[in-house]
């Protein structure tokens, strides 16, 4: 079968439980992103989206597309070029694949360890890791979260991996490590253009990126969406 960007290999409640039918949130309302699922929310330019990590060990794969065109999206390759580094800091502006500003990191209460190198997990990744059955994954969560609010994915871009800890060594090698974020950490992102943000509570359980040992997957929360 020819590759279809919007096709999901399996499904979970992401497909059936959008935050609203049209994707717009009620201002100031708290929304949950259940463990192993994703949600999409439409933002107006100037809106501030705050994401909270209740237990501290949950990675959030964050994507954003312009409302003008789903073919213009947050581009990690372009962000690395624009920033001149492979890490992000509070105050950084993240750009699209067309190099236009889309999101600004306006506050980060965590130690600031996030990733802009690693692709989102998908079913082929879990096949490589030895999984034979369906496994929840961030690529499908992205597709389903968009479908749930009436948008068809035209690409599956690399995400901004919030709280993912991928240290890079002097020789260029990197490793998969547990998050250094702590319970209750938040990150606040300001929309610099009308866009749709998609967040996946990463279900990766075969590498340490969501913690080590008996990992307790948790939800993420979106406590605040407000206009400035």
Regions flagged by a language model, labelled:
Residues 43-51, 189-202:
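Noncatalytic modules at the cell exterior or secretory-pathway interfaces
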Residues 56-58, 72, 101, 120-130, ...:
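Extracytoplasmic/secretory-pathway segments with low complexity and glycosylation-like composition
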Residues 39, 175-189:
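Beta-sandwich interaction modules
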Residues 57-60, 113, 196, 203-211:
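Short, surface-exposed beta-strand/loop "edge" segments at domain boundaries and coil↔beta transitions
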């Amino acid at each position: 079968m020819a590759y279809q960007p919007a096709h999901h290999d399996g499904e979970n409640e992401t497909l059936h439980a959008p935050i609203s039918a049209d994707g717009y949130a009620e201002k100031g309302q708290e929304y949950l992103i259940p463990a192993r699922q994703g949600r999409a929310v439409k933002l107006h330019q100037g809106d501030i989206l705050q994401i909270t990590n209740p237990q501290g060990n949950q990675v959030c794969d964050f994507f954003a597309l312009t409302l003008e065109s789903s073919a213009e999206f947050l581009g990690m390759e372009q962000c690395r070029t624009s920033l001149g580094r492979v890490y992000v800091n509070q105050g950084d502006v993240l750009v699209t694949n067309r190099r236009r500003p889309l999101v600004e990191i306006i506050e980060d209460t965590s130690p600031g360890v996030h990733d802009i190198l690693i692709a989102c997990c998908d079913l082929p990744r879990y096949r490589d890791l030895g999984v034979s059955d369906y496994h929840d994954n961030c690529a499908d969560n992205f597709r389903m979260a968009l479908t749930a609010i009436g948008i068809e994915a035209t690409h599956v871009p690399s995400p901004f991996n919030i709280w993912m800890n991928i240290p890079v060594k002097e020789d260029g090698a990197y490793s998969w490590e547990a998050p250094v974020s702590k319970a209750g950490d938040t990150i606040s992102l300001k929309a610099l253009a009308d866009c749709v943000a998609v967040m996946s509570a990463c279900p990766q359980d075969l590498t340490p990126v969501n913690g080590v040992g008996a990992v307790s997957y948790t939800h993420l929360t979106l406590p605040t969406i407000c206009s400035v």
